[in-house]
Curated annotation (Swiss-Prot):
InterPro entries documented for this protein: AAA+_ATPase, ABC_transporter-like_ATP-bd, ABC_transporter-like_CS, P-loop_NTPase, PstB-like
Location relative to the cell: Cell inner membrane
Residues bound to ATP: G68, P69, S70, G71, C72, G73, K74, S75
Name of the encoding gene: pstB
Molecular function as annotated in GO: ATP binding; ATP hydrolysis activity; ATPase-coupled phosphate ion transmembrane transporter activity
Broad class of where this protein is predominantly found: membrane
First-tier enzyme category under EC: translocase
GO cellular component terms, A-Z: plasma membrane
GO terms classed as biological process: phosphate ion transmembrane transport
Keywords carried by this UniProt record: ATP-binding, Cell inner membrane, Cell membrane, Membrane, Nucleotide-binding, Phosphate transport, Translocase, Transport
Protein source organism: Jannaschia sp. (strain CCS1)
Assigned protein family: Belongs to the ABC transporter superfamily. Phosphate importer (TC 3.A.1.7) family.
E.C. numbers: 7.3.2.1
Protein's recorded name: Phosphate import ATP-binding protein PstB
SUPFAM superfamilies: P-loop containing nucleoside triphosphate hydrolases (SSF52540)
Length: 283
């Protein structure tokens, strides 16, 4: 990993190494969440215990899906992976999260630089009020990834190609990103996220605001992106998780109930709570 201070999608992925690892992660919200032990905060009734002792391995060049009912903690845990919870008042995380063996919560780690390595795509497309070109160029500019204008143009083109939108926008790069359709805006946001060459790409329900055609385009793109990046996707759609991921984690009431190969989760789950969720009996 650089210094942070500065196939068929349903097939099982061969796990050669782990890109990220989380161990004993708890997340607490509330005025009482402070620099106390996890046990102390768990006993405090003024504190919401949102994530409870979660261990997860994120494999290299693999799509990992987080599924579970609304409020189960899957999006909260996703934000742990690039310290987005740092921006929320009264939120406290305990445990350890590493990116290629380095503790991302080490005080020496710059969260802004971390987020260049662990990119994020949000539920609702959120292009900046800038041109298509400047949306994609934003990250490389602030992180100093381009030596000159030609370098920057090359990064923008490659990122738009990786997001499968280059052919649709190559003749209007100066047009506002906000003028694109919803599906195009989401692919623009994906291009913006991959422009800093992240090692992990987090996606928080990236298709929930899209129509079926745009959803299919993004799902196809996710399978292509995993040839270069580790992808972690939160989704309410079990069908989508089954289509795009190789590993699936099922969350319920802040607990990681089961984490396994996607095929096994959906055909032969080990925990009865997982079976109840995927068959529609809970959720």
């Amino acid at each position: 990993m650089k210094d942070m201070s500065m196939s068929n999608p349903t097939e099982s992925a061969a796990v050669t190494d782990m890109k990220m690892q989380a161990r004993g992660v708890d997340v607490f919200y509330g005025a009482g969440a402070s620099a106390r032990s996890a046990d102390d905060m768990a006993a405090d009734k003024s504190v919401t215990h949102a994530i409870k002792e979660v261990d997860v391995d994120i494999a290299d060049k693999t799509v990992t899906a987080f599924i579970g009912p609304s409020g189960c903690g899957k999006s909260t845990f996703l934000r742990v992976l690039n310290r987005m919870n740092d921006t929320i008042d009264g939120c406290r995380m305990t445990g350890k999260v590493t990116l290629e063996g380095e503790d991302i919560y080490d005080p020496k780690v710059d969260p802004v630089q971390l987020r260049a390595k662990v990119g994020m795509v949000f539920q609702k497309p959120n292009p900046f009020p800038k041109s298509i070109f400047d949306n994609v160029a934003y990250g490389p500019r602030i992180h100093g990834l381009a030596r000159n204008k030609a370098d920057l143009s090359d990064i923008v083109e490659k990122s738009l190609r990786r997001a499968a939108i280059w052919e649709e926008v190559k003749d209007r790069l100066d047009a506002p990103g906000t003028g694109l359709s919803g599906g195009q805006q989401q692919r623009l946001c994906i291009a913006r996220a991959v422009a800093t060459s992240p090692e992990v790409l987090l996606m928080d329900e990236p298709c929930s605001a899209l129509d079926p055609i745009a959803t299919a385009q993004v799902e196809e793109l996710i399978d292509e992106l995993r040839t270069r990046f580790s992808v972690v996707i939160v989704t309410h759609s079990m069908q989508q998780a089954a289509r795009v991921s190789q590993k699936t984690a099922f969350f319920h009431l802040g607990n990681l109930v089961e984490f396994d190969e996607t095929d096994k989760i959906f055909t032969n789950p080990s925990d009865p709570r997982t079976e109840s969720y995927i068959t529609g009996r809970i959720g």
